[in-house]
Structure formats: structure tokens, C-alpha cells
Amino acid sequence: MPGTVDALVGPEWNGEVAFAPGNASFQAFVTALRVLEGEDAAAAWVDGMAANDPELTENNLASLDLVNTGEVELGLINHYYWFRQAAEVGAENMRAQLKFLPGDPGGIVNVTGAAILKGAEGDEDALAFVEYLVSEKAQEYFVEETFEYPLLPGIAAPEGLPSIESLVNPELDLSDLESLEQTQQLLADAGLI
């Protein structure tokens, strides 16, 4: 497996990569690629991927299924899809294996957040909901059922998942990923969405 997403435009990967270009996390990754490597490099990568006859899927699970059936060699997915399927069928019954790309735009650690809207600061239900999301019970659910990284210290990540501290994220301010419309246009121009 390559150590960088840049390698995926090589001829050896022609017809061997699956991904879901309409997926929000894939689009966040391409946006990160634009921010980290520049517009020209990102456009060249997207065009190279489009020219490399990829298997375009509706979602990450479909990409994972194509790897597991041997139709492609590699799928660009979020880790938790692999863990969910492994919990259902057993990791030993899966052809697909996970690879994290340290320091590469393909290995960004993205986040999800919750906040209370300005003007709703006194809404007790909104506050209770946000407090619940960061409670031990909810964080254990995210680990055990959705195979996500926990926010609270003292709650272990899902078994088999590298510690979040061990992942090498590229130098990226996630607030710079706001230009989603340009990413979608880039993907559309390449015929991927």
C-alpha cells in the first residue's frame, strides 16, 4: 500500500481505487489537500484520480465492500466503517485492512463539534444535550458502537485503533477547511460528482 495519497494517481492504481466523492469526509480531505498543497497540486491530483478509472461509490461502506470482494485493491474510507464491519463479520473474514497515512493529507483527523447558538445560551435543553454528548455514557457509546475516538480522557479508544496521540496529523488548522464549494466545483470539473 502506498504511504501517501499522491501515489494513487500512478498507473499501478488504475482501476484499483474506490472512493465516495459525494461523501462529506472525502470532500473535507480534498479541501485539506487544496489548503496544504495548493490549488494546482490538488487539481492535478483530482484530475489524476479521475483519469485513473476509479470505482466511484455512494458511500464509504460500498468502497469497503469493493475491497473485501477483491474488485479493487484500495478504498479511501473513514476508519470506523472498517471497525463496524469487522465487529459484524470478524476482522479475520475481511480482505480489507486499515492503513493510516501519518502526516499525509489523506490521514487528516477531522472533528465533529456541538455548540449552543448565540441567543440560545439560556436554553436548558440545549445545554443538557451538549453536556450529554460529552458525558462518559455518550463517549462510551461513540467508542463501543460507532468506533470513534473519545473526547474524554480516561476512556480508551476502540481496541485495535491507534491512539489518537500516535497519529501524525499534517499541519492544518481545521477552520481553513471552509472552502467546500470550491472543492465541490473541482470534483465536478473532473467529472467525479
Feature roles, as predicted:
Residues M1-V72, Q85:
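Extracytoplasmic ligand-binding site segments that recognize negatively charged/polar headgroups
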Residues G15-P21, V46-A50, L56-T57, E92-K118, Y132-A156:
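Periplasmic-binding protein-like
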Residues E16-A20, E73-N78, Q97-F100:
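Structural recognition of the beta-strand scaffold that forms the well-ordered cores
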Residues R34, N110-G122, Y141:
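A bilobed periplasmic-binding-protein/Venus flytrap-type ligand-binding module shared by bacterial periplasmic
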Residues D40-A41, E148-I193:
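An extracytoplasmic/periplasmic, membrane-proximal ligand-sensing/linker region
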Residues E73-R95:
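A ligand-binding cleft/hinge motif common to bilobed small-molecule-binding domains
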Residues F129:
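Substrate/cofactor-recognition hotspot
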